[in-house]
């Protein structure tokens, strides 16, 4: 339990920040799912355009340190490889 005024304020800020980070993580998951759905549809050009639109979301969330930059790079690499594997 936060006893000092400073600790109470930091606790309030942590709650708000946690909610904000959760919304950003949700946006990341949605962007990744959109790309996967486009890949599973089998249309390479559509999948590539969806990838190009959503890769900035992945990068932005990594820049804000919501996820590690290597995790963002791993997602982008695997999704890009899946698109390239389409015939």
Swiss-Prot record:
Protein function: Binds directly to 16S ribosomal RNA.
InterPro entries according to UniProt: Ribosomal_bS20, Ribosomal_bS20_sf
Region (Disordered): 1-22
GO cellular component, as recorded: cytosol; small ribosomal subunit
Origin superkingdom: Bacteria
Gene Ontology molecular function: any one: small ribosomal subunit rRNA binding
Entry similarity comment: Belongs to the bacterial ribosomal protein bS20 family.
Name of the protein: Small ribosomal subunit protein bS20
Keywords assigned: Ribonucleoprotein, Ribosomal protein, RNA-binding, rRNA-binding
One annotated GO biological process: translation
Lineage: Bacteria, Pseudomonadati, Pseudomonadota, Betaproteobacteria, Nitrosomonadales
Compositionally biased tracts (Basic residues): 7-19
């Amino acid at each position: 339990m936060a006893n000092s005024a400073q600790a109470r304020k930091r606790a309030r800020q942590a709650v708000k920040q946690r909610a904000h980070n959760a919304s950003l993580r949700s946006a990341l998951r949605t962007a990744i799912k959109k790309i996967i759905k486009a890949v599973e549809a089998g249309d390479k050009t559509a999948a590539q355009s969806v990838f190009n639109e959503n890769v900035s979301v992945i990068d932005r969330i990594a820049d804000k340190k919501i996820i590690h930059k290597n995790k963002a790079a791993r997602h982008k690499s695997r999704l890009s490889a899946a698109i390239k594997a389409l015939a």
